[in-house]
């Protein structure tokens, strides 16, 4: 069975200009995933990483202890490798420039949600790490600038996630398909388990927090009712499955077919998910697996960011299901 390291080396020839940098970055992410996997599996045995840290992040959300642990681990691992010029995280207000000689001469920046769904940790529910890699646009040899991070998702060179569930799995793309690697704790190695992953064109699962139904736009309400109606021709009604962890919900739908929706709402007029840390990397993966990612009207990967922590509505998953949801959004578009 091929390991992640072997797979990365085999594919390195696809990026002759990377000079091994992408290999180093992915190796850093692999290391962080193994450390987070270890600590999550011990979470019930120690109070050091469970619960609220007492700090709010830049969005005003409570940071869990494991949020900060994962954030610091990711930053330290990337700094140690010196393969990236800068780092931006959902957990930190500003980007971080790695202002060493190697850092200034590095070609890439990375954006990450170090621990998606961290509120689930205390109740032993799946969580994940999301990452997105871009080639910098500022001159090599100088410190990175905000513009290096403010690129549309269609300029990503790699993206992926790690899901920490019944097993730990790393899924990533470099723009040539999606591949998944399952962690074997006995070997300490990620092994290729899901090659060339493809999301089914349609499915029977819709994932949305229906407790917020009254706050949703009319197009989403109509689509939910469509999912619940009986119709043998379209294999409805669909099944509602919502974990509350983007990575876990998307991963299930990637394997089985389905749609994940986190729309704008009266309490989140711009949506809740972050474009750069969640929307873009998940959208890149979805498209590379044959799916679609939309803000309800337009392709997520074409959005030009205007803020580092910009929010975005997200409709992502099986092609036919996302297209149907978009039809409802256009039909019942609100001013």
Curated annotation (Swiss-Prot):
The lineage of its organism: Bacteria, Pseudomonadati, Pseudomonadota, Gammaproteobacteria, Pasteurellales. Gene3D superfamilies: 3.40.190.80, Fructose-1,6-Bisphosphatase, subunit A, domain 1 (3.30.540.10). It comes from the Bacteria. Its cofactor is Mg(2+). One of its GO terms (molecular function) is magnesium ion binding. This is Fructose-1,6-bisphosphatase class 1. SUPFAM superfamilies: Carbohydrate phosphatase (SSF56655). Pathway: Carbohydrate biosynthesis; gluconeogenesis. It holds the Pfam family FBPase. It is found in: Cytoplasm. It comes from Mannheimia succiniciproducens (strain KCTC 0769BP / MBEL55E).
